[in-house]
Regions:
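Structural motif
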Residues: 30, 50, 84-86, 101-102, ...
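Boundary-proximal intrinsically disordered activation/regulatory segments immediately upstream
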Residues: 1-53, 133-134
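RNA substrate-binding interface of SAM-dependent RNA methyltransferases
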Residues: 96-166
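A short, local hydrophobic-aromatic micro-motif
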Residues: 47-48, 64, 125
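A short local structural element in Rossmann-fold oxidoreductases
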Residues: 41, 75, 111
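S-adenosyl-L-methionine/SAH cofactor-binding core of RNA-modifying enzymes
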Residues: 53-96, 139-166
């Protein structure tokens, strides 16, 4: 089946995932491009793939065929990709480990993504996002992490409550 209308209920839901409140409500987010879709798949986060009818995938997840116009609407890129993944949010691991990186009010998505990638390189166990940090599932954060965040423990905490207990 090929979905060509933005009035389709599934597509309406996925369009809402561009906003944080709906990502939180549905506990899902979107990724764009083959690399991020594969990284989400490797992390067991990928629930569904949206692709054009003439595209092929070897990943073992449900596929929904959509028109190029739908992919363009769902995309946040200037040059949309031919594949979008619908993913479930990662469950937070309450065990923080020994090497923590505490972040307070990092609001630029690109900066947060770069910090997350760097923290992985430096062997950080957990990245703690304090109040005021940009949403981890913001599409720009996801792109700038290049999927590294899918393989790390990243949690949201109130730093005022957390720090005295460390």
């Amino acid at each position: 089946m090929l979905i060509t209308s933005c009035d389709n209920e599934k597509i309406k839901k996925y369009l809402k995932l561009k906003e944080k409140k709906y990502r939180d409500f549905y506990n899902e987010f979107l990724v764009e491009g083959e690399h991020l879709v594969v990284e989400a798949y490797r992390s067991n986060l990928l629930e569904e793939i949206l692709i054009e009818q003439d595209e092929v995938t070897i990943l073992d997840v449900p596929i929904t065929y959509v028109s190029k116009e739908i992919l363009n609407k769902l995309s946040s890129l200037e040059t949309p990709t031919h594949i979008i993944g619908v993913c479930k949010k990662k469950e937070e691991n309450s065990e923080l480990g020994n090497k923590l990186l505490l972040l307070d009010r990092v609001q630029d998505p690109g900066n947060l993504g770069t910090i997350i990638r760097s923290s992985k390189a430096f062997g950080v166990d957990t990245v703690v996002l304090g109040n005021g940090c940009v949403d981890l599932y913001n599409e720009k954060v996801i792109r700038s992490t290049q999927g590294i965040g899918f393989h790390m423990n990243i949690v949201n905490r109130d730093l005022k409550k957390l720090i005295p207990n460390l």
